[in-house]
UniProtKB/Swiss-Prot annotation:
GO terms for biological process: D-alanine biosynthetic process. GO terms for cellular component: cytosol. SUPFAM superfamilies: Alanine racemase C-terminal domain-like (SSF50621), PLP-binding barrel (SSF51419). The active site is at K35, Y255. It catalyses: L-alanine = D-alanine. This is Alanine racemase. Its cofactor is pyridoxal 5'-phosphate.
Amino acid sequence: MKPFPRAEISRHALKNNLARLHELAPSSKVMAVVKANGYGHGLLNVAQCLDNADGFGLARLEEALALRAGGVKAKLLLLEGFFRATDLVTLVEHDIETVVHHESQIEMLEQAELNKPVTVWMKVDSGMHRLGFVPDEFHQIYQRLLACDNIAKPINLMTHFACADEPDNDCTAKQIAVFEELTKDLLGDRTLANSAGALFWQQSQASWIRPGIALYGVSPVVGDLGTKHGLIPAMELVSQLIAIRDHKAGQPVGYGSHWVAEKDTKLGVVAIGYGDGYPRNAPLGTPVLINGRLAPIVGRVSMDMLTVDLGAGAKDNVGDKAVLWGKDLPVEEVAEHIGTIAYELVTKLTPRVAVCLD
């Protein structure tokens, strides 16, 4: 018997989305970003499904080690870089590449005793102002990295966009110009484009692109849908109705008696709540798909359950499937109702939600 709630992950969708990104950037290799448990889709499952990706991007060393332990042989890159000097031995042992974005990392590399140099990606702060070396110090830092015997040559180069998900914002064009001016005539691979870069900024498609959310069929742009760009949603979050109740006009439901029925209706109780990662702050009216129609959430989302208004004439039954998001109820639209972004919804699912690869 299939567990509820569960996140059903489509192999077909994942493979389609990777192929679509290859189409959009035919001259670039694809570093599939699978951090945060594959954006909630299952780290190892996603990496094994995307076995024709050219490499994988992770946030933490533990994620990279999990892929190696699972038999993944492809290029792995730590996008946040390493945190401790002791990590360097592990990087060498498991052939894991790292971003270098801060003076402290350079000092650790210079002082380390390694039996093999580490492949690094020097991060340029071209305008995001979060991580990376600012333009004024770029050439000095680059020469310092060249002089370090613990760093493999050539040095790879990267940056990250602040506003690529705003196609009409010229911030991205300025960042591209800053990066290209600094790195012209230098050797090494380059990567600029995240999902939004790959979709909307063709000039950012360098030797590598590193899509994240687009791999999972979701648009990086608020108010947009991944399906408009040939992507297929990879996750369907489902649960079931565990109770159906006749509800009289004037009666409240849920904690705080937050919602009161204006007319007689039927309410359905769905087995999912904030203990599963569904947002407690989902407002009244947030849609849930029941038997092909949208039923609005009424009352507050609780730890294990939420309640929907099925309507007075509802013919639904206990045990019927409830879709919280998926191909017929895009996660982008649910995120808009809740006032967040799809990234947050898919990555915040808790271990109580079974992740099932079809």
